[in-house]
C-alpha cells in the first residue's frame, strides 16, 4: 500500500497557531501486553479542554487513483460533522487505494485494525512552531488510522508526512498501541525556517507502563537501536544547528524540544508511575523520571480507569485534607460533644475563584496548594482503549468512552467493529448549552453533584462503579456472541450486534444520569 503521496496543494490562508495551555491539556496512561492482567495492550487519554465531543464512525472505503484528501484546520472545534464555521482548507495530499474504518473524535483514537492512540499536548519551545506547515496532530492521527494496521507503521507514517508536508502544531505526544506493541511518539515543529518536524518514537517494553502529562518525556535516544527508536531525518544535525544540543552530551530529546531548565515530568507523571511501581521509591525531587516502569503487579483495566478518576484524595497532595469543620452535637443522653469531619462542600475540582476565596480565609502561611489533578471538570472526553490479539479485530478493539469529568462520568464501550453511534454523540456541547448533546446529560448531573460533593458523590460514585462492573460482567458474553457470528462468516451481523449493544449501554447511562439529576434537585431543592 502507498502510504505517502508525492504532491500537496496548500491554501493561501494561514492562521496563527496558538499553543495549548497545559492546564487545559491531557493525560495519557498506557501499558504493554505483558504488563496487563489479560495481555491486552492499553492506551488512554483525557481530552481536557474544548475539543469537539461529536464523533463519527468513518467507514472503510476504496478510492480512485486521482483521489485527494483535503486537510482542514480547526475541525477539532466544530459543533457537528457538517459545521464548517471558522474551518480553513489548508491543503490536500493524495489519497491511498483503501482506507480503514476508524472512530473520528477530537483526537481520532481507534481503527478497525485495533490500532489506537492516546494524545497529550506537550507544548515545547514556542520558536519551533511554524504555521506554514500543513498538519496538526489530529490530522496525522486520522491519516494514520485510515492507512495503518500497526503502531510502528503509524509512527513512521505520521513522522514522514509531517516532514514532507510540514507540521504546524505545538509539541504533541501520542501513545500508540496495537495488538502487540506500544510506542511513545513525541513531535514538534522544526522552527520558522523549516516547516518540517522534529520527532522521536520510542518503543515501550512489553512489561512496562508509561504516562504522558503535558511535558516532553523522551530522554536519551539510541540512534543505533532501530528496534526501539525511530527518529526524524537529520535530527541531531538540526538540533545542533538550532543550538539545542552541543554534540557532546547524551542526546536527550526532552531537552532539545523543551529546554534543560524545564523539568521533564509533572505531578501527574509522578503520581501514575509511583502508583504503578511504589517499590521504585520515585520522588518529585528527581531530575528525571523513567519514561516507563515495570509495575509491581499486573495492571487491570480498572487500574487505568481509577487513575483517570484520580484527584489525589487521601494523599499528601489532597487539596481538601484540611477542609474540616467542627460541629457541636448532642448524643442520645443530651450531652454535647464536638464532632470534626470533612465539610461536604469540600472537593478537589475547585475553580480558581473558589480556591482564592478559601485561601483568603486561611492563615497566609498555610494556603491550599493548587494541584493539577488527573480528573478535571473541564475534560471534554476521555477513553481507555484495549487492543487484544486473541479476539477478532471487530470485537478485540474496544474504547471505554466517557464524556465530561472522568471522576464523575460512566464509561461506555465503543467497538472497533461498531458502525454507528447514537445521535447525541454526534453533536458537541461546547459552543453553547445543547440538551441534545450527550455531554450535557452527564455534565448537568455532575456539576450539580459537585455543589455539595460530600452528598452528591453518594449517588455518582456508586453509579460509575456499577456501569464499570456491568461492562466487566457482560463483555465476555458479548465477545462470545460476536466471535461466533464472525466464525460463521456473518461479519455484518456481528457488527450490527456490537453496535446495538453499545447503543443499549450508552442509553442506560444517559437514563441513569437523568434520573440522578432529578434526585439531586429533590435533595438540594431547599438549599445545598
Where is each model-derived feature located?
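Bacterial N-terminal signal peptides
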Residues: 1-7
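A contiguous strand-loop segment
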Residues: 14-137, 157-307, 314, 318
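Substrate-recognition/cap regions that form aromatic- and gly/pro-loop-enriched pockets
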Residues: 346-483
